[in-house]
Amino acid sequence: MSRVLSRRDIADRIAKGQTIVIYEDSVLNLDKWIKFHPGGDKSIYHMIGRDATDEMNAYHDDQTITKFKIWKIGRIDYPWENMLPPIQGGRFSKIDERDDIGDYDINLTSKWRSVDESNQYTKIPKNDRLASEAEVKIYPKIPQGVVPSLDLKEAYEKKIVVDPAIVSENYDNERVYEDLTNFPSLDVKNQEWIASEYRKLHGEITAAGLYQCNYVRYLKEFLRIGTLFGISFYLLSLKWFAISAICLGFAWQQLVFIAHDAGHISITHNYQVDNIIGMTVASWIGGLSLGWWKRNHNVHHLVTNDPVHDPDIQHLPFFAVSTRLFHNVYSTYYDKFLWFDKFAQKVVPIQHYLYYPILCFGRFNLYRLSWMHVLLGQGPRRGKAAWFRYYELAGLSFFNYWFFYLIIYKQMPTNAERFKYVMISHIATMIVHVQITLSHFAMSTSDLGVTESFPMRQLRTSMDVDCPRWLDFFHGGLQFQVIHHLFPRLPRHNLRDAQSLVIKFCDKVGIKYSIYGFAAGNDVVISHLQQIAQQAHTMLECAKTMKKEATDTEFHTNKHVLAANVNEKRKQE
């Protein structure tokens, strides 16, 4: 039997740079595995010091789950309270550095974070960084070791947690307070009960056979997409360029859903087979990197809608879905600052008007990100996923050959026609960007601390779209993002069957299940973007007024000093 590791022992190991994760009652050291992890290193870093049982079970199949305990170095025989991972700003010390601190207090702070700390960025020397720690200190919204409750409202008002003199901080604090009011208590025991009910739900989903893929439905999907490509190429041969481009764009839009399913290993449930399917349709036919998307998407699923950590809502300088993004946050995904610069200060206050126009150009940005991922080798370089990079590099090259050379260059008679075909086909894919952002842009972006359970976070930050069954193909499973976030490997065509079970679960644990019609959901997103835009406008106007007042004060002060000097000089004369 492995030895029991105390909370102090575990914190000491993390302080020494070890990648320690809790799975059930096992303590895992993933140092040797993290370089081979097909899902990337960032997703593991966000689980350091945490009980990742629900996350690990949700994202892996049974065969993979049986291998987890290879990395077991000990166990716990006591209820685990999550620590704040270093990548999120957690602070840890070695045993010989702080012997006076007991096991229970190791991850607690003795005081609230000060106002000054929240706006400081201190560079951490490379040799002093823990596993995953950013090059600058990250200050979480909820201080390390604090369990958020409604009592925090008083702390906000007394300026203990953050400085509410900043207009945008007041707004964000109110959003946190709303979440604390509208969602179940973040008490450790209550969140553990929610997690236990979620595990029962997962058992019901499995027992109902909902992990079994319906391949007939996928055959229909491929026939539908193949028909769109066929119509597009036929119209191209007739020189009906505009309609051909629209059909091609619609085919790409539908193809994204196949890649999404394959990336989650939810088609055949075989890692290599599903990735080959996903990479083929994404890079060879669509010109996009599945590897880039998976690296991004895995983190998104774990820290959904966190402005500091989730790349899916980090769209400055074009969009801000949280006022926290007004303060030049350091992205732990991109490892750089997201500057709220002059350009962002012009665009964000009108983002609700620019939302749809900007999404029309979304695919061009995905090309850039895909090539960066492949050329810079940002994906796995070891293990069973290492060869994916070269397959995708060949795929992206082939896409540029067949689309930009064979179709755009060879088939279009003029540069004007080439430009129109490219723009029309890419603008036609805009709808998928609307579908992607619809699920999260209007939802909570609050940081509620490390006690929040996996299921509550997913339900709090995601929304579903209500549509008739016959229209499911159009949304490609993205209309069930709540269910998908709870059970990422569930085949797309079974999500609707799981919906009733999820609704019962939500009713039992007291968590709101958010669902809107497509039009209503878009209205909610635009309304939220407008609210954030108004906050940006107000903050910038306040800054402008303060600057003017400071200038006026300086002017009057200088005038009085000058007058006094003149009078003094006259007296001397």
UniProtKB/Swiss-Prot annotation:
Location of the motif Histidine box-3: 481-485
Q: Which superkingdom heads the taxonomic lineage of this protein's source?
A: Eukaryota
Give the InterPro entries listed for this entry.
Answer: Cyt_B5-like_heme/steroid-bd, Cyt_B5-like_heme/steroid_sf, FA_desaturase_dom, Fatty_acid_desaturase
Motif Histidine box-2 in this chain: where?
Answer: 297-301
Q: Which family does it belong to?
A: Belongs to the fatty acid desaturase type 1 family.
Q: How does it sit in the membrane?
A: Multi-pass membrane protein
The motif Histidine box-1: which residues?
Answer: 260-264
Q: Which reaction does it catalyse?
A: an N-acylsphing-4-enine + 2 Fe(II)-[cytochrome b5] + O2 + 2 H(+) = a (4E,8E)-4-sphinga-4,8-dienine ceramide + 2 Fe(III)-[cytochrome b5] + 2 H2O
Q: Name the Enzyme Commission number(s) assigned to this protein.
A: 1.14.19.18
Biological process, per Gene Ontology: sphingolipid metabolic process
Organism the protein comes from: Kluyveromyces lactis (strain ATCC 8585 / CBS 2359 / DSM 70799 / NBRC 1267 / NRRL Y-1140 / WM37) (Yeast)
Name of the gene this protein is made from = SLD
Q: Which residues form the Cytochrome b5 heme-binding domain?
A: 2-77
Q: Which GO terms describe its molecular function?
A: metal ion binding; oxidoreductase activity, acting on paired donors, with oxidation of a pair of donors resulting in the reduction of molecular oxygen to two molecules of water
Alphabetized, the UniProt keywords read: Electron transport, Heme, Iron, Lipid metabolism, Membrane, Metal-binding, Oxidoreductase, Sphingolipid metabolism, Transmembrane, Transmembrane helix, Transport
Q: What class of enzyme is it?
A: oxidoreductase
Name by which UniProt lists this protein: Delta 8-(E)-sphingolipid desaturase
Localization of this protein: Membrane
The annotated pathway is:
Lipid metabolism; sphingolipid metabolism
Q: Does the keyword Iron apply?
A: yes
